[in-house]
Structures are given as structure tokens and as C-alpha cells.
């Protein structure tokens, strides 16, 4: 019954005499079914009138300030269409993977994106193999022109040269010899030198 739930919050804020009056009115309305229907209709009409009045006031306010189009909301651009074309998804976007090409800043070649980093290493001479080759070149140059190069560097005339000639971090003497197959198997714990 909607009539019994509505006056409960208002009763708590009112004085005790008003609560008694509301309770007495409620008991009278619930005793007679004819009055109960009348009270329910009055409550329904009151709620409907409040809702309609609220909407009317809101529309009137929006019209006065010029925002009546805001009541309509944002119009959809077009209905969503499902695309049924091969090699396209339902939205019409291609599903085929596109090869992305990058331009090398050093040699201006087009290179696939997956191969760009290795190409750039080789192109600029900064990869592992390139640095080994460059180190070997420096080592051979040091051996042939060590006397002329050292007098040039120590005189302080290294204006345009690189800093690589003075590096002590690499030496060709420190290379380890590769172990042979025989030397690895001689001390092995697997067969202790026994043949089966």
C-alpha cells in the first residue's frame, strides 16, 4: 500500500501531536475501502502532477536560455552497418597486416620495420661484428704506424682525430685460445677416460 509508506519520513520530523493526528487519519483511511481508493487516486494524481510540472519547467527553462536542442541529445551520425567484404572486419577496417617500412637515416634505404635495428647497426658500424672488425683494423693500424701515430698523439695535435688510439680497454694479446675437442673430454667426469 503506497499510502502507508509515504508519511513515515515526515512523521519523524514533526511534533508528537502532529504524529498522532497523521496516525489517526491513516487509521480512518484504512478502515473504509472506499476512502482508501480515494486516497490512492489522490496520491497518484499528485505524483503525476509533480512529474509533469517538473518536465514542463525544465523544457521552459531550456527554451528561454536557448539550449532546447540539448534536450534532444547528440544525434548519431549513421546507423552501424556491418561490413561483409573479404579481408575486412565488421567495421570495414583491413585485417591484412601491412608491412611498415622505415627509411634509414644513414643510407636513405627503405627497410622493413622488423629489420630496421639490425640494418642500422650494420649501416653505422655499431653492431657486434662491426665493432670486432673495427677493432681488428685498429689493431693492425697500431702495429704498422705505431711510431708515427704515438708522436702525433703525444704532441697534442689530436684536433680532428678520435679518442680510440689511446684506449687501453682492448688488446689482441688477451684473446683466449679455443679449447679443442680432445682437451674437453680428457678431464670429463662422464666417462673418466674409459671407452666402452
Swiss-Prot record:
GO biological process, one term: chromatin organization
Composition bias type Polar residues, residue spans: 142-153
Start and end residues, zinc fingers (SGF11-type): 102-123
Composition bias type Low complexity, residue spans: 182-196
Cellular-component GO terms for this entry: cytoplasm; DUBm complex; nuclear pore; nucleoplasm; SAGA complex
A matching Pfam family: Sgf11
Localization annotation: Nucleus, Nucleoplasm; Cytoplasm
Superkingdom in the source lineage: Eukaryota
GO molecular function: transcription coactivator activity; zinc ion binding
Modified residues (Phosphoserine): 172
Keyword terms of this UniProt record: Activator, Chromatin regulator, Cytoplasm, Metal-binding, mRNA transport, Nucleus, Phosphoprotein, Protein transport, Transcription, Transcription regulation, Translocation, Transport, Zinc, Zinc-finger
InterPro entries, per database record: SAGA_su_Sgf11, SGF11
PANTHER family referenced in this protein's UniProt entry, alphabetically: ATAXIN-7-LIKE PROTEIN 3
Summary of subunit composition and partner proteins: Component of some SAGA transcription coactivator-HAT complexes, at least composed of Ada2b, not/nonstop, Pcaf/Gcn5, Sgf11 and Spt3. Within the SAGA complex, Sgf11, e(y)2, and not/nonstop form an additional subcomplex of SAGA called the DUB module (deubiquitination module). Interacts directly with not/nonstop. Interacts with the AMEX complex component xmas-2. Interacts with Cbp80; important for promoter recruitment of Sgf11 that is not associated with the DUB module.
Family named by the database record: Belongs to the SGF11 family.
HAMAP family recorded: Sgf11 (MF_03047)
Annotated function: Component of the transcription regulatory histone acetylation (HAT) complex SAGA, a multiprotein complex that activates transcription by remodeling chromatin and mediating histone acetylation and deubiquitination. Within the SAGA complex, participates in a subcomplex that specifically deubiquitinates histone H2B. The SAGA complex is recruited to specific gene promoters by activators, where it is required for transcription. Required for nuclear receptor-mediated transactivation. Binds independently on SAGA to promoters in an RNA-dependent manner.
Domain characteristics, as noted in the entry: The long N-terminal helix forms part of the 'assembly lobe' of the SAGA deubiquitination module. The C-terminal SGF11-type zinc-finger domain together with the C-terminal catalytic domain of not/nonstop forms the 'catalytic lobe' of the SAGA deubiquitination module.
Designated name of the protein: SAGA-associated factor 11 homolog
Species of origin: Drosophila persimilis (Fruit fly)
Chain's gene name: Sgf11
Amino acid at each position: 500500500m503506497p499510502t502507508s509508506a509515504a508519511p513515515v519520513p515526515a512523521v519523524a520530523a514533526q511534533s508528537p501531536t502532529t504524529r498522532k493526528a497523521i496516525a489517526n487519519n491513516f487509521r480512518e483511511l484504512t478502515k473504509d475501502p472506499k476512502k482508501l481508493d480515494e486516497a490512492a487516486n489522490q496520491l497518484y494524481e499528485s505524483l503525476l502532477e509533480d512529474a509533469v510540472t517538473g518536465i514542463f519547467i525544465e523544457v521552459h527553462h531550456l527554451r528561454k536560455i536557448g539550449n532546447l536542442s540539448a534536450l534532444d541529445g547528440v544525434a548519431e551520425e549513421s546507423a552501424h552497418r556491418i561490413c561483409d567484404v573479404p579481408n575486412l572486419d565488421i567495421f570495414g577496417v583491413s585485417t591484412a597486416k601491412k608491412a611498415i617500412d622505415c627509411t634509414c637515416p644513414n643510407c636513405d634505404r627503405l627497410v622493413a620495420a622488423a629489420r630496421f635495428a639490425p640494418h642500422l647497426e650494420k649501416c653505422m658500424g655499431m653492431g657486434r661484428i662491426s665493432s670486432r672488425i673495427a677493432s681488428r683494423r685498429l689493431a693492425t693500424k697500431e702495429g704498422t704506424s705505431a711510431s708515427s701515430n704515438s708522436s702525433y698523439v703525444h704532441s697534442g695535435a689530436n684536433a680532428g682525430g678520435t679518442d680510440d688510439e689511446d684506449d687501453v680497454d682492448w688488446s689482441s694479446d688477451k684473446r683466449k685460445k679455443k679449447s679443442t675437442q680432445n682437451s674437453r673430454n680428457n678431464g670429463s667426469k662422464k666417462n673418466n677416460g674409459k671407452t666402452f
